Structure formats: C-alpha cells, structure tokens
C-alpha cells in the first residue's frame, strides 16, 4: 500500500466518520450521481428530504432559494449563519441530532479547488476537511497559505459563506515541539489555525492510601455478603428441618 495522504489520512478519516454515522456519497458514479446545486454544492435531494421532515407544512424550495440569496451577500456569511440558527424554518435540529441527515463525500470540486472531504448536514456542505501526508515538511504550512488565498478569491465567496468550519489533519499526535503537526480547525474567513489538543492531562490514579482504603471497603462488603448468604442458608436448613419433623410427627 502506498504511503500518502490518501492511504494514511483520508481513508482512515472517512472510515472514522462512517462509524460516527456519516453516509458516503460517491461523486464519480454515473448511476448514483448526487443531485447537486452547482452554485453552492448543496445536495438538493438531501436538503429537501431533511427540510420536509423537520417542516412538514413548509416548502423546501422556497427555503433553498432564500439560502442561496443570503449566500451571495457580502457579509462574510453572517446572514446565512443567522438563517441557519434563527429562521422560522428548522434547517437543522440542534436539540435532537438524530433527526438530522449526515453525509460525506471525497474530492467534490467547487470552482477552482476541491476539498479532500466534505461533510453535509441535511444536504448543506458545512464542513470541509483537508488532509496532508504525515511527516511532510510543509504540509500544514502550505495549507495555511492556500486557505488564506482561497477565501480572498471572489469566486469562492458563496462557498466560504456557507462553510462553517475547516479541518486540517496529517493524522499525527500533538507535539508541542512541532507546531505544524497534528489536527487543526479554522473558520472560513480566518487564517488562524486552532489545535485539537487536551488542555490538561489529568492524573486520575488515586494515591496509595486511598487505594488501600478502597480495597478494604471492597473486602468488607464481600465479607458482609458472605455472612448474609450463610445466614440465609442456615435459615433455609432450619425451615427444612422443621418441615421434616412435622411430617414425621404427623406420620406417627
């Protein structure tokens, strides 16, 4: 198996996302080609299905038209974000995540670029993931530069207004001595990459004295249980003995 970003990062990421509940949509299949809105990369059928389930009396196409209109505003996506959260229509069920439709695809092009992985929630491409080959010297650094140039390009305005978060990963653990290694996230219009890393490593091992105390308590509980069982056995034996004596007395 070749050692590259596809085998070491992209495929493992897709497999992990599948375990989380994302359905994979192939984009290179002529038979099952997704019904895409070419201006936004919104999955029209998925959006309609999810919208009509969450809003049985509303029209999905009217909502889609409103979304597309807001995505063209020069407001860095603010209007679309407000519609996503505060619309009279329910675009995403934030209270019951299982009511939403989760899908993913790989290498779905938009204008002049092509994210490695795109995540859809109710048909909306809200998350993009860029993967880099592990131990590549300029991998994440180059992606920071590309990300900045990408959102500065006017032809990507709609796509950047729609995307809520970008993820970048080389599938390597955090290393404080290697600032460009690991997993990062960023907003569409931000050149700042934030790390995914544990803020604190917690030592949850109790001190020796506490361990001894816990062991003693467990032993005491076991002893009490054994004593109770012995008492119950004795009571049962006593009852059986009394029954035998009664039977013997009646027989004689």
Predicted regions and their residues:
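Ala/Thr-enriched low-complexity intrinsically disordered regions
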Residues: 238-241, 251
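Long, intrinsically disordered low-complexity tandem-repeat segments
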Residues: 214-239
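An alpha-helical interface "stripe"
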Residues: 1-216, 247-252
């Amino acid at each position: 198996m070749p050692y590259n970003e596809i085998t070491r990062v992209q495929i493992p990421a897709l497999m992990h996302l599948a375990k989380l509940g994302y359905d994979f949509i192939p984009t290179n299949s002529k038979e099952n080609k997704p019904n895409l809105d070419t201006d936004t990369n919104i999955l029209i059928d998925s959006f309609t299905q999810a919208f009509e389930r969450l809003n049985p009396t509303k029209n999905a196409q009217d909502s889609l038209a409103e979304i597309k209109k807001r995505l063209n505003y020069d407001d860095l996506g603010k209007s679309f974000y407000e519609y996503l959260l505060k619309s009279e229509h329910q675009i995403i069920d934030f209270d019951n995540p299982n009511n939403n439709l989760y899908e993913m695809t790989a290498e779905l092009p938009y204008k002049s670029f092509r994210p490695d992985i795109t995540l859809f929630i109710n048909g909306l491409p809200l998350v993009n993931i860029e993967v880099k080959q592990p131990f590549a010297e300029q991998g994440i650094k180059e992606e920071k530069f590309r990300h900045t140039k990408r959102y500065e390009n006017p032809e990507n305005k709609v796509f950047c207004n729609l995307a809520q978060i970008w993820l970048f990963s080389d599938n390597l653990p955090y290393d404080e001595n290697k600032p460009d290694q690991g997993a990062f996230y960023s907003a569409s219009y931000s050149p700042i990459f934030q790390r995914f890393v544990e803020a604190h490593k917690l030592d949850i091992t109790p001190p020796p004295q506490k361990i001894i105390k816990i062991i003693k308590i467990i032993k005491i509980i076991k002893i009490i249980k054994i004593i109770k069982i012995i008492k119950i056995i004795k009571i049962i034996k006593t009852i059986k003995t009394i029954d035998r004596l009664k039977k013997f007395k009646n027989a004689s």
